[in-house]
Amino acid sequence: MPIKNNSKKEGKINFVIGLGRSGFWAAKYLRSIGKRVIVWESKENKELLERKKILEKLDISVCLNKQFLFDEFYKFLRQIESIVVSPAIPFDHKTIIKLKERGIVVIGEINIAWESLKNINWIGITGTNGKTTVTHLLSHILRENNLFAPFAGNIGTPLCEIAYSTKSKNIDWIVAELSSFQIEIATHCIKPKIGIWTTFTPDHLDRHKTLDNYFKIKNSLLKQSEFRIYNYDDQYLKENFKSLLNGIWITTNPNVSDSDHCDYWINNENFIVERREKLLSLKNFKLKGNHNTQNLLLAVAAARKIGLSTERIKNALLSYEQLPHRMETIFQRDELEIINDSKATNFDSSVAGINAIKGSPIIISGGRLKNGDSIEWVKIINKKAKAVFLFGESSQTLKKLILEGGFKNDILTFNDLSEVINYAYSYIKNNQSETLLFSPSCSSFDQFRDYEQRGDIFKKLIYEKFNIKFIAH
């Protein structure tokens, strides 16, 4: 249900649950259109206190250390216009269920943004892995061609921040990265002009319970999209080729049997082909790995649908700089390269990164283990790794998996990243090594705020050891 200015609802309360980035901007936007807003946040820290001060100056009530319990809402039930919940709160949370049973509107930040921005062309990008790179790359291609195409959503800029901006009326395209958490609460609300599905592998099953539920949530975005782009290289999407709604398919496989189903592929000369016509060479594409070639094809297919010429796309790609923490080379000297792939938060993304490395890398992995199939990860470790250094909550579990797979090279466990880097520095000096790859294959939440903080700390530790100036992103 949309939130609109309505004199009959004057004085009604819009609760915002969670004071993360999306909650902060949802509250600011709602207040800017004349709504009464109360924000509840279960934690308290310096950053939250600063946000609280900013919102209170806008006449928004903010309560920290406030738990999301139904009893807390009871006295407000007749006054509530809507409750905007953080994507981190499961939609089957008992408080949400009780509120909905009483007819209370429970929505997400994206629902609010959509109501404001629905007359603008949206590109909705989802997938287990690759969605951030595709979002960033496609936005870059469009912006380099004089289209106002900001990226937003799960990539870090809340969509309500875009809605709040006075520049929003001038936007040509919104390039939105949408996670399953965001899609789940906004099902049947968002209707993108173009929907892109990058990959699908088991993830977030602690939240979505079953793989089928996870698939349906992702697919709901594509069903709502006017035009769809899929990745035929993804095994699960490929297996569901016939059941998915019609759309454009891409593949990096030059074999005719595969490309018969696809509109974009890579030929044996390393050219992107569009329906049998050569478009552009991959020679100058900077990103490592076959998974990034898939990301490129998805972005190119969308850019072509929007109407950009091959030459315009090619010129935009020449100036593209990759996002940090994604196969990011942070050190290269003599024969040693050190790569930060902190964004590899599950086994599948880790496999993609390891596959992109030539030779036998030293691999650093660890963190909080997610649900997912480790078979291919163990295989690639056995096939390629010169040594494996494990840290954090999952270190012993990962060690057991690797040893059960028959790994014969060095494998060591550590408490944290600092210990790993201290040892790795000495190990590299005493053993000829070409590549040190930070590929966690796990979430960061055992020791870090997010994968970005984890990646920045990894870089800081490396730079301290190698005496290089560190610049955090």
Curated annotation (Swiss-Prot):
Catalytic activity: UDP-N-acetyl-alpha-D-muramoyl-L-alanine + D-glutamate + ATP = UDP-N-acetyl-alpha-D-muramoyl-L-alanyl-D-glutamate + ADP + phosphate + H(+)
Domain of life according to the entry: Bacteria
Function of the molecule: Cell wall formation. Catalyzes the addition of glutamate to the nucleotide precursor UDP-N-acetylmuramoyl-L-alanine (UMA).
One Pfam family this sequence matches: Mur_ligase_M
Name of this protein: UDP-N-acetylmuramoylalanine--D-glutamate ligase
Any one cellular-component term (Gene Ontology): cytoplasm
Family, similarity comment: Belongs to the MurCDEF family.
InterPro entries for the chain: Mur-like_cat_sf, Mur_ligase_C_dom_sf, Mur_ligase_cen, MurD
HAMAP family registered for this protein in UniProt: MurD (MF_00639)
EC assignment: 6.3.2.9
Keywords for the protein's UniProt record, in alphabetical order: ATP-binding, Cell cycle, Cell division, Cell shape, Cell wall biogenesis/degradation, Cytoplasm, Ligase, Nucleotide-binding, Peptidoglycan synthesis
Organism of origin: Prochlorococcus marinus subsp. pastoris (strain CCMP1986 / NIES-2087 / MED4)
Leading EC class: ligase
Main location: cytoplasm
